[in-house]
Amino acid sequence: MFASCHCVPRGRRTMKMIHFRSSSIKSLSQEMRCTIRLLDDSEISCHIQRETKGQFLIDHICNYYSLLEKDYFGIRYVDPEKQRHWLEPNKSIFKQMKTHPPYTMCFRVKFYPHEPLKIKEELTRYLLYLQIKRDIFHGRLLCSFSDAAYLGACIVQAELGDYDPDEHPENYISEFEIFPKQSQKLERKIVEIHKNELRGQSPPVAEFNLLLKAHTLETYGVDPHPCKDSTGTTTFLGFTAAGFVVFQGNKRIHLIKWPDVCKLKFEGKTFYVIGTQKEKKAMLAFHTSTPAACKHLWKCGVENQAFYKYAKSSQIKTVSSSKIFFKGSRFRYSGKVAKEVVEASSKIQREPPEVHRANITQSRSSHSLNKQLIINMEPLQPLLSSPSEQEEELPLGEGVPLPKEENISAPLISSSPVKAAQEYEDPPSEEEDKIKEEPLTISELVYNPSASLLPTPVDDDEIDMLFDCPSRLELEREDTDSFEDLEADENAFLIAEEEELKEARRALSWSYDILTGHIRVNPLVKSFSRLLVVGLGLLLFVFPLLLLLLESGIDLSFLCEIRQTPEFEQFHYEYYCPLKEWVTGKVHRILYMLGCS
């Protein structure tokens, strides 16, 4: 039996797709509506079944766009706990979603092309442009003042075309919400570049120039994950074409290139990156707010490493976030790698498809322009008609200082848009001189990456609350107890301690009676107890012996293999070395006291 699958973006266009389904009555009763929001904020809808896999939705959208370079894109959704996920193509959609239908997802760029020059078709470049525009608006793209002005001018040129004094009033840039917060100085610079440098550029050319500039920035392609490092400092982790990156504030403090990343793993809320830095093995540990966030971070890392690192998809292996004694989560990236995608793009020989750009030039009102740009938000739950829907909001807190212009390296080519922009600097006024003396903040540019990850943007104070534990809150509580309360608490503690000692004595006497035969127990229980005691005894003997062999310099093949595993390195550096130092210190102290006596 065949059934049609409709795709209706805002009631403007209609498309039909044919999807084979079983003719059973049960499958007919399990149809579920799914809505996907696209990068231009239009929507398409279709009906799926319980067994429909994620690849069907990806193909559905790519057929709607007539998109061939589809491996850069993915579908994202948010679960009821507000944790974001990428839809896995080889798994059932129904099993991945943790909410009841109808489902709402969004179509986004998943892997940012390392070199936009190698994108073959204009359609793919336009979709990437829409994603970069969203990244700029949500504060995910960190850049200098001159770069921000040029990026903003490219957006204005692509959306409005050439500057026309009859159509564009004096404050026409203020109608565009390009950045979360933008100063008048930044708007004046955007106007200047739009008037003088971008005239004559068609929308595809302006969009392409934006991609060329954006891909040179450090935070290009970074989807920041908020974490805490070992010192409790808020950091943001990300994955780019270059490798694994760590940001604190506006500074990149770590970059481990993909060939140097040995293993990515997670345990509970802790994410580990084991790699090579300065020819030495290092392990970085970061703490997330929930185990689900940690697993999502790990899967994103595994997918990005596979996409950017390997030459062929056949080289990709199933990875396991293994623990020392138990098997952890297993995951394998099943798509193409970057080199295969570029090679496939170079072989495209068809007539380029028509690109339908979102038309925002019909209305010049501030409300309509802002609505068109501000509506770029991540969908969480079903449609707007659903009261449970939540969307991203603008960053509310103050941003972090950004690098000054003189600290930004000069462009490599003379025709660089940024270099041309610097030649047209405004004559310094008193207001601008005052601004230049201070580091750029959220009033001019923004890097508030937490807004891109959590549905409701949070600042450092709120992130701290995510990581607060009851013990920490107890320590921070004001000491307002009276002396009588403290004395009563001490007496209660002593009574509880005596009760625990009595229980321990009773347990020891009961165990002694069982071992000596004074108390009869089931023979099966007695055999199991003896087996348990023997097993524990062997473990207490074998484990120290194995540890002694591993820590010695004995060069045996199986010992060398165990020493090179990330799990043993973690045990060595986090447990064995601190314990060894503590025992050594105690022994030295005892020997010193004996020598003095």
From Swiss-Prot:
Residues 32-312 form the FERM domain. It is found in: Membrane. Residues 409-435 are annotated as: Disordered. It comes from the Eukaryota. GO terms for molecular function: cytoskeletal protein binding. The chain crosses the membrane at residues 531-551. One of its GO terms (biological process) is actomyosin structure organization. PANTHER family: 4.1 G PROTEIN, FERM DOMAIN-CONTAINING PROTEIN 3. Putative tumor suppressor gene that may be implicated in the origin and progression of lung cancer. This is FERM domain-containing protein 3. It comes from Pongo abelii (Sumatran orangutan). The gene is FRMD3.
